[in-house]
């Protein structure tokens, strides 16, 4: 079995794979101040609850966009698992050809998503990840990572609205029947949800055109991340949701580098 960790700005997602099957996964809050032992205690509890043992784990791979947390996580893995983890970054084989001006600028999470999507779908792709930031990535059928777009995420955009507009209440992000709303709460909800759905459709439309102008077939659009389901219900562009895309990518990269 292998342990995979996707370290994001808001959450750390952990998964356990037995062969190619995801048998358990959890989500922890990202906290730069936690020590290796504090993370170790959390992982012990998660393993215990699922009747898993640290000795079952043969390898570990980590993808992170939070450099400050890596010392604690690597130390935790070393101390509790006695394993040196694979860290997604320069020198790690991914099978993806990064066409960015500076490939080192591409976030590990975006690379991992590209690896998974290419492995699963084998076609031109637009990958949308609704995380702390919302990212759009263009990948060709030949596994060339062309680039993409980064937008403020739904939660941080909403938080900024609530923090800066004193009279606007915080609201639950749920769909409204339409956009002509009769109260402030519904007006905010519709603005956020339909606004982001429109953003998705517009960016995907432009990205598809640019990819097809390069000779690609019409790209398949896959979405992942916490708000993927909510936005996909209103977006006309998303073909499929894959909630474990990043974990799958980590598994594939581990297999390429073990």
From Swiss-Prot:
EC number(s) on file: 2.7.1.33
UniProt keyword annotation of Nucleotide-binding present: yes
Catalytic activity, as annotated: (R)-pantothenate + ATP = (R)-4'-phosphopantothenate + ADP + H(+)
Cofactor: binding details: A monovalent cation. Ammonium or potassium.
Localization (cell): Cytoplasm
Alphabetical list of InterPro entries matching this protein: ATPase_NBD, Type_III_PanK
Keywords annotated in UniProt: ATP-binding, Coenzyme A biosynthesis, Cytoplasm, Kinase, Metal-binding, Nucleotide-binding, Potassium, Transferase
Residues engaged in binding substrate: 100, 107-110, 184
GO biological process per UniProt: coenzyme A biosynthetic process
Active site: 109 (proton acceptor)
Domain of life: Bacteria
Residues that hold ATP according to the record: 6-13, 132
CC per GO annotation: cytoplasm
Cofactors named for this entry: NH4(+); K(+)
Involved pathway(s): Cofactor biosynthesis; coenzyme A biosynthesis; CoA from (R)-pantothenate: step 1/5
GO MF annotations, alphabetized: ATP binding; metal ion binding; pantothenate kinase activity
Pfam families: Pan_kinase
Cell membrane recorded as keyword: no
Binding-site residues for K(+), renumbered to this chain: 129
Assembly and oligomerization: Homodimer.
HAMAP family associated with the record: Pantothen_kinase_3
Free-text function comment from the UniProt entry: Catalyzes the phosphorylation of pantothenate (Pan), the first step in CoA biosynthesis.
Family classification: Belongs to the type III pantothenate kinase family.
Protein name, per record: Type III pantothenate kinase
């Amino acid at each position: 079995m292998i342990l995979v960790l996707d370290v994001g700005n808001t959450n750390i997602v952990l998964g356990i794979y037995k062969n190619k099957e995801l048998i358990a996964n959890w989500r922890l809050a990202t906290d730069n101040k936690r020590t290796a032992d504090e993370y170790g205690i959390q992982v012990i509890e998660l393993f215990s609850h699922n009747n898993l043992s640290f000795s079952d784990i043969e390898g570990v791979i980590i993808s992170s966009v939070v450099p400050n947390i890596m010392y604690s996580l690597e130390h935790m893995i070393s101390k509790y698992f006695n394993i040196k983890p694979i860290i997604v970054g320069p020198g790690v084989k991914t099978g993806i050809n990064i066409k960015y001006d500076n490939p080192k600028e591409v976030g590990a999470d975006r690379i991992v998503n590209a690896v998974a999507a290419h492995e699963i779908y084998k076609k031109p792709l637009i990958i949308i990840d609704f995380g702390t930031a919302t990212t759009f990535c263009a990948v060709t059928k030949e596994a060339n990572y062309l680039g993409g777009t980064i937008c403020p995420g739904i939660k941080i955009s909403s938080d900024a609205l609530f923090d800066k507009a004193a009279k606007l209440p915080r609201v639950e992000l749920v769909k409204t029947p339409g956009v002509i709303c009769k109260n402030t709460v519904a007006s905010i909800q519709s603005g956020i949800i339909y606004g982001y759905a429109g953003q998705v459709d517009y960016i995907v439309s432009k990205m598809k055109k640019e990819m097809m102008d390069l000779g690609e077939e019409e790209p398949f659009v896959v979405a992942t991340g916490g708000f993927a389901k909510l936005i996909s219900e209103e977006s006309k562009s998303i073909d499929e949701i894959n909630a474990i895309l990043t974990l799958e990518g980590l598994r594939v990269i581990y297999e390429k580098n073990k």
